[in-house]
Amino acid sequence: MSTNVADLLHTIKNNWCDRSILVVGDVMLDQYIWGDVGRISPEAPVPIVRATHRTEQPGGAANVALNIARLGARATIVGFTGTDDNERALKDYLSSNRVEADFVSCEGFPTITKLRILSGRQQMLRLDNERAESRPSTAYQKLIERALHHLPQSDALILSDYAKGVLLPEVCQTLIQAAAQRKIPVLVDPKNVDFSRYRGATTISPNLGELALAARVDLENLNDLLYAAQQMVRNLGLSFLTATLGEKGIALVTRDKTTISAAVARQVFDVSGAGDAVIATLSLSLASGLDPELGVHLANLAGAIVVSKVGTAPVEQYELLNALTAESVPVAQAKVVTRSELLELVARWRRNDERIVVTNGCFDLLHVGHISLLEQARGFGDRLVVAINSDRSVRELKGNSRPIVGEQERARVLAAIAAVDAVVIFDERTPLELIEATRPDVLVKGGDYAVSGVVGAEEVQSWGGHVKIVPIVEGFSTTKLIEKGH
C-alpha cells in the first residue's frame, strides 16, 4: 500500500467524478417512523411510540447506487420494482441525487419496502412488504437488456444480491461474461449461499456469516474460513475475495495470501448499509486503477463511517476524505476544527439523534478545575464541543499580558482530553454567534453565574435547550496559577 495520502485524496476528489458504475440487483425503499416511547400499552405488553416524523431513502442495491453518487461518481441502477407509489418515491429520490434509475416494473409485485419504527437510537419493529420470488421470464429478459445497454459506458459492474429474486444464476453469468469481454471489473455483494452463480467475477464481498454459510465452515473458526475463502478464489476464478469481519476489519484474500485490514474504531449505532458503502467504495477504487489493498483500506474507512450513523445512510465523499486525512495526523489534532467543519460535524451528530453540549472559555493554563468542568459537561450529552477564545479575543477580555498559552496550543491540549469531541476557536468577544450557529441542546458554564448572566442562555432556551451551571473547583484558577508562578 505504497500510495501516499495526498495521492489518494487527489484520486478521490479528481478521478472518481469521471467514473461511472452500473449496479444491478434487489432495489428497496427503506422507510422510518421516528418517535418517543412514554408508556406501555394497556392493550398488550408493548411500548407505545408517539410518532414525531417520518423519513425514507433507498435501500438494498439502490443504496449502493446512492453511495456511489455521494462519493462523487455517476451511478446507474437496474432492478425490479412494482407499479406503486413506493416505486415513484424511490425514483424521485434517486433522481434528485444524480442516480439514473432504469427499473423494470412488474405487475403484481410490490416495490420491496422495509418500514422501521425507532425511538431514539433503538429500533422497535420492522415491517417488510415484498414477494421474494421469481418474476416472469419476460421481466428477466428486459432486465438483462437494460443492464447490457448501460454496460459499455460503465467502469465497473456491481451485482448487489439481497436474495430477493433478481440475480438468478443465468442473469449473473450473462452479465459477468459480458463485462469480462469488455475488461470491466465485476464486484458481487452476495446473499445467496451458492457462490457458483458468481463464477468469473473480479471479487465477491461477503460478510463473515455469509462466507461461513457458503463455505459450510463453523463461523467461530476464522482460520478455516479464510482457508475456504482461498479455495473459493481458485475454484470460482476470482481475482480476489474480500470478507468483512466486523470488529476485526476486512480480509483481502487472494489465491495464496490473506491480508487483514484492521477495523477503524468508531461508535457503532447501526450496521445497516455498511456493506453497501464497502462495495461502492471498493468499486470506485478498482475503477480508478487503485490496487485491491488500497481499495480495501478505503472501503474499511467507508464502512466505519456508515456504522456510526443511525439507519441506512450513505457515506459522503467529504466524510471519506476527512477520515483519510485524520489517519495522517494525530487524533487530538484532528479534533481541532474550523467553524465550517464544526457545523458539518454537528449536522452529522444530529442525524444520529445525538445530544450536543457546548461550553466555552479561554482555557489558559489548563488546570484541574477545567478538567472537572469538561468531564461534567460531557455527562450532559453525547458530544462535547469546546469553543475557545482566540488570542486576540483573550487580550480584549483579559489584557495584553494574556493569554499565557497560544490559541493553537490551547486547542491541541483540550483536544487531547477524552471527554472532548471537537475544539473550535472563535475570534469574537463572546461565543454568541457560534452558539446560534450550532444550536446546542445543552450550554454549560463553569462558575457561580446566574443562568440569566450566561452568554447565549436566552437563545439556547428559546429552541428548547438547557443551560447548566457547573460549580468551580475551589482553589484553582488561571489567575491564581499565574500569581503563584510569580
UniProtKB/Swiss-Prot annotation:
Enzyme class: transferase
Pfam families, sorted: CTP_transf_like (PF01467), PfkB (PF00294)
Entry's EC annotation: 2.7.1.167, 2.7.7.70
The protein's annotated pathway: Nucleotide-sugar biosynthesis; ADP-L-glycero-beta-D-manno-heptose biosynthesis; ADP-L-glycero-beta-D-manno-heptose from D-glycero-beta-D-manno-heptose 7-phosphate: step 1/4; Nucleotide-sugar biosynthesis; ADP-L-glycero-beta-D-manno-heptose biosynthesis; ADP-L-glycero-beta-D-manno-heptose from D-glycero-beta-D-manno-heptose 7-phosphate: step 3/4
InterPro entries attached to this UniProt entry: Bifunc_HldE (IPR023030), Carboh/pur_kinase_PfkB_CS (IPR002173), Cyt_trans-like (IPR004821), PfkB_dom (IPR011611), RfaE_dom_I (IPR011913), RfaE_dom_II (IPR011914), Ribokinase-like (IPR029056), Rossmann-like_a/b/a_fold (IPR014729)
GO molecular function: ATP binding; heptose 7-phosphate kinase activity; heptose-1-phosphate adenylyltransferase activity; phosphotransferase activity, alcohol group as acceptor
Gene3D superfamilies linked to this entry: 3.40.1190.20, HUPs (3.40.50.620)
Region (Cytidylyltransferase): 358-486
Biological function: Catalyzes the ADP transfer from ATP to D-glycero-beta-D-manno-heptose 1-phosphate, yielding ADP-D-glycero-beta-D-manno-heptose.
Assembly behavior: Homodimer.
Official protein name in the record: Bifunctional protein HldE
Organism, scientific name: Koribacter versatilis (strain Ellin345)
Organism lineage string: Bacteria, Pseudomonadati, Acidobacteriota, Terriglobia, Terriglobales
